[in-house]
Amino acid sequence: MEQTFIMIKPDGVQRGLVGEIIGRFEKKGFSLKGLKLITVDRAFAEKHYADLSAKPFFNGLVEYIVSGPVVSMVWEGKGVLTTGRKIIGATNPLESAPGTIRGDYAIDIGRNVIHGSDAVESARKEIALWFPEGVAEWQSSLHCWIYE
């Protein structure tokens, strides 16, 4: 079954959106496999966003991520990566449709509440980085009501 990495950024944590965001993924039928509340240091944030290191906004992004705790999660389910991106909405909240997390809760691109893996390979890398100890191996009793 496919997995993806989702991170609620410091603004989402500070604004009390953790439960709402988790609820959206659960209500869709995805399974939570890993969850951490963590304050990351600069080196870790730089490693997570290494692919953006040449961008002019890189330092500001790193400062934002280390400014407070984040909630890192691994979600599992059929099509979770693509569907998760749709639930999240466009990177720029002003381009996000109402009903998406960013469309409902964000205005500025620099405070866009949530991060989600954008491809299978980035999901693998991010899960390995944030959850080196692995994730919980379990199956919800609702599985048979969601999947054929």
UniProtKB/Swiss-Prot annotation:
Keywords, sorted A to Z: ATP-binding, Kinase, Magnesium, Metal-binding, Nucleotide metabolism, Nucleotide-binding, Phosphoprotein, Transferase
Cofactor: Mg(2+)
GO BP annotations listed: CTP biosynthetic process; GTP biosynthetic process; UTP biosynthetic process
EC number: 2.7.4.6
InterPro entries for this protein: NDK-like_dom, NDK-like_dom_sf, Nucleoside_diP_kinase, Nucleoside_diP_kinase_AS
SUPFAM superfamilies: Nucleoside diphosphate kinase, NDK
Active site per database record: H115
Residues reported to bind ATP: K9, F57, R85, T91, R102, N112
Coiled-coil portions: none
Catalytic activity from the UniProt record: a 2'-deoxyribonucleoside 5'-diphosphate + ATP = a 2'-deoxyribonucleoside 5'-triphosphate + ADP; a ribonucleoside 5'-diphosphate + ATP = a ribonucleoside 5'-triphosphate + ADP
CDD domains attached to this UniProt entry: NDPk_I (cd04413)
The protein's role, per its UniProt record: Major role in the synthesis of nucleoside triphosphates other than ATP. The ATP gamma phosphate is transferred to the NDP beta phosphate via a ping-pong mechanism, using a phosphorylated active-site intermediate.
Entry similarity comment: Belongs to the NDK family.
PANTHER family: NUCLEOSIDE DIPHOSPHATE KINASE
Protein's UniProt name: Nucleoside diphosphate kinase
Organism: Capsicum annuum (Capsicum pepper)
Upper classification of the organism: Eukaryota, Viridiplantae, Streptophyta, Embryophyta, Tracheophyta
